[in-house]
Structure formats: C-alpha cells, structure tokens
C-alpha cells in the first residue's frame, strides 16, 4: 500500500493468518515501529514464525483466530491474507480487534455474495497492477489481487479505489515520513 495513499500507523499489528510469516517479514524489513501479535492455525509453521518474532512480539498459541477468545487490547492495524472462503469471517473478527484492517485478497472478493456486508462496510480498494507470487519459484496464477483497507472502523457506504503504481511506489509497508 503506497504510503501516500494509506498511512498505516506504527504500534501493535496483528497478522491472524501468519502462515510462513511473509507479511511480518516484509513489514519488519521496512519498519521498526511495529510490534506483532502473530496467529496461525497450522502448527507446522511454529518454528518459522518463532524465528520472525522480535522482542515485544507475541506468538499466540496455535488455533483459530476467528473463534478464539481475544484477551488483547485493540491493535492499531490488522493485516492479513486469509483463505478466500473464510475472508468475510476474518474481516468481521478483525473489526473487533483492530482500528485499521488491511486484507490482501482476490479482486473478485467484492461480489454479490458479500453485497449485504459491503453496503455498510465498504473498504478502500488498492488494485495490484501485477499478479503477486505466492510460490517459492516466483510463479503466479491467473488471478488479480487487491488490498482491501478499512481505515476508520466499521460503518461506511463508500470507499476509494486506486491502482498501485509499482514502478514509482515506495514499499507497501514503508512508514510515511
């Protein structure tokens, strides 16, 4: 997310589906003002996530983010790339746990199946002009992606739309000056 489009504050950030830690690793490379609460359902990622955590970060016991009892204060940012079929449940849970919610998801996430939710919770949408790779070999699929950002909480009927300009953009997680 270009820093001139979205100003993601420092502080406590949650990644509720941390997986192999790609989002926290990328953020940590550009920002020192973020402390993490990392959550993952798949225990196979425990060792990888423990190497990413810095002093002050919290690695939650492995389990389901959406249904777990939440005992932490509201975070500054919740940033995620949840499974497509569960994304709406993740977003709803995220609203209760963070001030700003940012989700990387297929562009088709804005669709009639979620119309009743989106009528009252319209995100800002930042389309990626290039397909991201989610594989170790750098390959991509035939799917377009976008960042969906709810910058100010729950209820709103309109959001902004922008195309990220990759050749000129600052890193998507770089703190704005």
Segments predicted by a language model, with ranges:
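Class I S-adenosyl-L-methionine-dependent methyltransferase catalytic core
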Residues: 1-177
């Amino acid at each position: 997310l270009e820093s001139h489009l979205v100003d993601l504050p420092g502080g406590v950030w949650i990644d509720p589906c941390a997986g192999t830690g790609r989002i926290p690793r990328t953020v940590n490379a550009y920002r020192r003002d973020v402390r993490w609460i990392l959550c993952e359902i798949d225990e196979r990622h425990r060792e990888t996530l423990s190497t990413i955590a810095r002093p002050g970060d919290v690695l939650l016991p492995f389990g389901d983010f959406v249904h777990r009892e939440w005992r932490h204060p509201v975070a500054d940012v919740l940033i995620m790339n949840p499974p497509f079929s569960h994304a709406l449940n993740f977003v709803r849970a995220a609203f209760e746990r963070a001030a700003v919610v940012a989700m990387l998801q297929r562009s088709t996430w804005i669709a009639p199946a979620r119309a009743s939710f989106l009528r009252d919770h319209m995100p800002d949408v930042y389309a990626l002009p290039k397909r991201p790779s989610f594989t170790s070999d750098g390959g991509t699929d035939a799917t377009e992606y976008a960042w969906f950002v709810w910058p100010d909480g729950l209820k709103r009927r309109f959001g902004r739309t922008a195309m990220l300009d990759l050749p000129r953009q600052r890193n998507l997680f770089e703190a704005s000056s």
